[in-house]
Amino acid sequence: MSPIALKIDVDTYRGTREGAMRLADLLERLDVRATFLFSLGPDHTGRAIKRAFRRGFLGKVKRTSVVQHYGVKTLMYGVLLPGPHIGRRCGEFMRGIAGRGFEVGVHTWDHVRWQDGVGQAGEPWTRRELTLARDQFTEVFGRAPQVHGAAGWQMNRYVPALQQELGFRYASDTRGTGPFLPVLDPGVGTVPQLPTTLPTLDELIGRSDLRAPDPVDHLLAVTAEQARDEVFTLHAELEGGVYLGAFERLLRAWRQRDRQLTDLAGYAARLSGNLPHCRIVSGTVAGRSGHLAVQAPARADVTH
């Protein structure tokens, strides 16, 4: 059966110390591989309050309890409390996960800063943020990162070329339908994109337009119908918290259906040498507020 790659975004200080560890325990118990992508700089989650003015954000807040998932203290970081430096204070936790055999990679330096700023940023800003994250990862793990997954699926036109320059081997920054090489200006990048292909659990909570009322049943129906390679993104703060039971049920059901569960490294190892060339554009995803980096249809007229 086609594989499902599991990508775990770890956004916060609390998520690194608590949610990521719960997920590692569950995955180890079930003998399932997954990729953990860490935020490596300061936790400024509280500064995300400005998103309250973004269309669709308040609807998501009503469907999913932000306080329950993140905790009051986390929501004060960067506003009423100084943001703890995740890379410096959580290195032992991160190395512990890598030591248990899980793939680890870069999510971001400052999650809120990247998610809210990269879309309008220039090359120097983007280079600085990526370099800070790469260097902190190298300090924590003693080796350079191989994989990058952008915070909030937010990018700009400089990211693919900088990933190539900074030594990343593959990335999962986008939403889409399958692996591709990003079209640059000019040419085509060499760092494959492995886009998230499935909706996240929090994008499905409380919606009335699903194949099944329960988000887990909806995901099972979608993956059975599509029967293709998939990338599923989850969050340490959500599936490593209140959604842990739902995530375990999803994993067990996929296993019962003979789906191979793997990490991004295992998925990337299966790639052919003839990936489609696609532009990365701005688009929307049901259940997620704002615009995201989305895979456009393949281009046949672009060469390296």
Identify the role of each PLM range.
Residues 1-147, 152-192, 212-232, 239-304:
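Catalytic alpha-helical scaffold of carbohydrate-active enzymes acting on polysaccharides/glycoconjugates
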